[in-house]
Regions:
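… and, occasionally, acidic/histidine-rich disordered N-termini of signaling adaptors
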Residues: 77, 111-296, 347-363
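Terminal output helix/cap of sensory domains in signal transduction proteins
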Residues: 46-75, 339-342
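PAS and related sensory helical modules
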Residues: 29, 36-53, 190, 208, ...
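Sensory modules in modular signal-transduction proteins
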Residues: 1-33, 37
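PAS and PAS-like sensory/regulatory domains
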Residues: 70-84, 227-229
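Sensory coupling linkers of modular signal transduction proteins
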Residues: 87-117, 180
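Active-site-proximal, acidic helix/loop segment immediately C-terminal to a metal-coordinating Asp/Glu
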Residues: 39-40, 183-203, 293-349
Length: 363
């Protein structure tokens, strides 16, 4: 197996969902342990063998080279398979396909099939997949009005974010930034998001406990020492009116806008998720937050936009001023305003992904 393909299969080996790599002839050249446990060792077989295996029933057409998606039913649990073309030049052309349980996140993917059917470029396919795993702007659980924007610097970005319900009183939100760009970084965003979902119950004990678990999962990948992920977690307890925060090297600190328009920054230190973070402890900070207050999370691509004449960056101060000025506007408007203002602040772009979350506490 070639070095580039070997690095990708090494990452797929750690996934907790099924994945394989196939060549242009639809021959399976690699199958990860999870998929092998379900289907057996299919290396060397054609991809069509999955459709004749046991109780797996195809409910939509087989994936094609254009990056279409297909749904499978496994014991009445819906799974969706995604395919991304991978052109490694002289090493050959391949497809990476993975099968993910979509019973909890199905609403996120409702437009995936139609979007992917028209796309031929491998980077555009990966970009659509990456964007589609992000939460939609909506009101969640009658508790949080959630609005976000994501603008990657390149076709494949490294920012990602999500929110999820832990129980009837507690809700988890986070934003993260993977170092670098390209196929490896985009695959790592999918992996880290999946690990958050798998380990989310650890946040009930503490957001710092969740970070410690993610560090272990990351280190198990044995990636290059230059690879790292910054993350900030915020757990909202509706019953106690508390927001508990842990930071793993994310240099854009959470910003709280109170219902009277006053702003508060929550500065916290912490090591980025990386090899050198193994065994380190993370801190927690808990603040009071009430209905009518607003939580803003963002990545450094926004604050690093630089004025080409003065050399000054847009900075967290630029975010704070806009958040205070437009605190009475809805989150969707504010997210767009901050994005637009940071972009036109300079003629020269910082060339980094830009993401922002506006979470209004409703109850």
């Amino acid at each position: 197996m070639t070095p580039q393909l070997g690095a990708i299969t090494k990452l797929l080996e750690k996934f907790t969902f099924s994945a394989w790599v196939v060549d242009d002839d639809q021959t399976i050249i690699y199958i990860n342990p999870v998929m092998e446990e379900l289907f057996g060792n299919l290396a060397g077989e054609k991809t069509s063998i999955i459709y004749d295996c046991g109780s797996y029933e195809v409910v939509s057409k087989q994936i094609g080279d254009a990056g279409e998606s297909s749904e499978l039913s496994i014991s009445d649990i819906p799974f969706r398979c995604f395919s991304c073309k991978l052109d490694l030049g002289e090493e050959g052309r391949f497809r990476v396909e993975y099968f993910e349980d979509i019973s909890e996140q199905k609403h996120i993917y409702n437009n995936m099939t139609q979007a992917l059917a028209k796309i031929n470029s491998e980077t555009k396919i990966a970009k659509i997949i990456q964007n589609s795993i992000l939460p939609i702007n909506d009101t969640y659980w009658n508790t949080i009005a959630y609005n976000s924007m994501y603008m990657p610097a390149d076709d494949l970005g490294g920012d990602f974010y999500d929110l999820m319900k832990l129980n009837d009183d507690e809700y988890l939100m986070y934003i993260a930034d993977v170092a670098g760009h390209g196929i490896q970084s985009s695959l790592l965003t999918v992996f880290m998001r999946e690990r958050v979902i798998t380990n989310r119950k650890a946040a009930l004990a503490g957001t710092n406990e969740l970070l410690s678990k993610l560090v272990l999962d990351f280190c198990a990948l044995d990636l290059d020492s230059m690879m790292y992920v910054t993350m900030v977690f915020c757990k909202y307890n509706k019953a106690l009116r508390e927001l508990t925060i842990s930071n793993a090297g994310h240099n854009c600190f959470p910003l709280i806008i109170r219902n009277n328009g006053r702003s508060e920054t929550i500065p916290m230190s912490g090591m980025p998720i990386s090899k050198i973070a193994e065994g380190m402890d993370y801190d927690e900070e808990t603040i009071i937050i009430n209905p009518g207050d607003r939580l803003i999370l963002f990545t450094d691509g926004i604050v690093e936009e630089v004025d080409s004449t003065t050399g000054q960056s847009f900075g967290t101060e630029g975010v704070r001023k806009l958040a205070e000025k437009y605190h009475e506007y809805d989150g969707s408007y504010l997210a767009r305003k901050i994005m637009d203002e940071s972009k036109k602040y300079a003629l020269i772009s910082a060339k980094d992904d830009r993401s922002i979350i506006i979470a209004d506490i409703l109850a």
